[in-house]
Regions:
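C-terminal helical cap
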Residues: 85-92, 250, 258-263, 305-345, ...
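Alpha-helical scaffold segments that flank or form the walls of functional sites
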Residues: 53-119, 143-157, 391-399
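Short acidic/histidine-rich active-site segments
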Residues: 192-199, 262-264, 271-297, 326-333
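Active-site gating loops and adjacent loop-to-helix segments of metal-dependent hydrolytic enzymes
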Residues: 51-83, 122-140, 200-227, 247-250, ...
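C-terminal cap of metal-dependent C-N hydrolases
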Residues: 330-379, 383-387
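Metal-coordinating catalytic core of metallo-dependent amide/deamination hydrolases
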Residues: 109-239
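N-terminal metal-binding scaffold of metallo-dependent hydrolase/deaminase domains
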Residues: 1-24, 35
Length: 401
């Protein structure tokens, strides 16, 4: 089976080994009723957008953005971004997620919170002002100067939190902005993060304007740098998949958000793997998910891939969990006494399937060998205070909408 039973030593560097029972250890944890796994990794999200959770329900993507999200974001301040981020991080830790690749405004407000929480992250900030310059006015350049300064200052949280560069999408960023971001990425060694081929409309508009599909277009302007994070990739040709593979890019599957916004296209996981693309999993923001539960995202990814390809063998439990935890060096323990984890089956052979498709409570979270959650309680954030702050902040955020 895929589950091993026994006594294990967890090492600070993220490795583990079998215990002989006589080692000098910092702490002994009774894991007899626990399942320990690698932690979940959220490769595309917008952390402050817990402020927008359940806002503008039942709208098409572009209508939702233009009438709900973008107008509210004009009220966004660094303080509000901090409050939303703190809530998102608390939610992720409570669900066993220890990494987030974020894309949003005010990275200088977001990154310290991610670092202080004890998790890992890539906090990607924009290169243009927010709110944007009025028509006819020039961008002040403040955003890109601040972002460059943050990148040059180096990672936060003992190296756990990097700063990256966000370019929203081909339909919101000019060629000049995209080229500048790519140059900055090469010069500073910072990660690029972009939405790609999320909707038919986006793809059709790009093709009409440039004669190319979005990923082809980005390749034609030499946008990609190593490790570029491409969110969604729901309407992608096989040629574009080969471009992603050639550029060592990550294609991030966000199935819950795509279904909720009726984007229509589902990333073809088998075709991506066949093309050699590195696929990751993400929730998108709480505005379009509406949660940040990566276990639920893994379940949804497995189900939609089986359904769309008429093939129940795609993304079996082990492959699904490997997709959701890819790159993790941290640990999470799960409650095996929860009724949702029964029956375990002979040799605990049903445990991983139960975890993915049924669920249970996250008990402990360890990052860099340090506990940030124990016995179901997060140690680095006051969840009750965070929750109340979010509720209060939302009232101000929507006051003029």
């Amino acid at each position: 089976g895929v589950v091993r039973e026994g006594d294990f030593l967890l090492h600070e560097d993220g490795s583990y080994s079998l215990s002989n029972g006589d080692e000098d250890v910092l702490e002994v944890i009774d894991g007899s009723e626990m399942l320990i796994t690698r932690s979940l990794q959220n490769w595309h999200t917008h952390l402050p957008m817990t402020l927008n959770r359940s806002m503008g329900e039942g709208m098409a993507l572009m209508d939702w953005l233009q009438t709900s999200i973008f107008p509210s974001e004009r009220n966004l301040t660094p303080e509000l971004a901090s409050i939303g981020t703190r809530a998102s991080v608390a939610e992720m830790i409570s669900g066993g997620t220890t990494f987030a690749c974020d894309m949003y405004h005010f990275p200088s407000a977001i990154a310290p919170i991610v670092a202080d929480s004890g998790i890992r992250g890539i906090v990607c900030g924009p290169t243009t002002d927010w709110p944007p310059a009025e028509e006819g006015e020039e961008d002040s350049g403040n955003a890109i100067r601040e972002l460059e300064s943050m990148i040059r200052s180096g990672p936060l949280g003992s190296g756990r939190v990097e700063i990256g560069i966000a370019t929203h999408a081909v339909y919101t960023c000019s060629e000049e902005v995209l080229r500048k971001a790519s140059e900055m990425s090469r010069e500073l060694g910072a990660r690029l993060h972009i939405h790609t081929s999320e909707t038919r409309e986006e793809v059709a508009q790009c093709h009409e304007k440039t004669g190319m599909y979005p990923i082809e277009y980005l390749d034609s302007i030499d946008y990609f740098t190593e490790g570029t994070v491409c969110a969604h990739c729901g309407w992608v040709t096989k040629k574009e998949m080969r471009i992603l593979a050639r550029n060592d890019s990550h294609a991030v599957h966000c199935p819950v958000s795509n279904q909720k916004l009726a984007c229509g296209g589902t990333m073809s996981y088998p075709a991506m793997i066949e093309a050699g693309v590195d696929v990751r999993l993400g929730t998108d923001g709480a505005a379009s998910n509406n949660g940040l539960d990566m276990r639920a995202e893994a379940k949804t990814a497995s189900l939609i891939q089986k359904h769309d390809h008429w093939d129940a063998t795609i993304l079996n439990p082990l492959e699904t969990w490997q997709l959701a935890t890819k790159g993790s060096s941290d640990w999470v323990t799960w409650d095996l006494t929860d009724i949702r984890m029964r029956p375990r089956g002979r040799g605990s052979r049903r445990v991983l399937s139960n975890l993915i498709y049924s669920g249970t409570s996250c008990l402990d979270v360890f990052v860099d060998g340090i506990a940030i959650r124990r016995s179901g309680k997060t140690l680095t954030l006051n969840e009750e205070r965070v929750s109340l702050d979010l509720e209060e902040a939302a009232q101000d955020y929507y006051s003029e909408i």
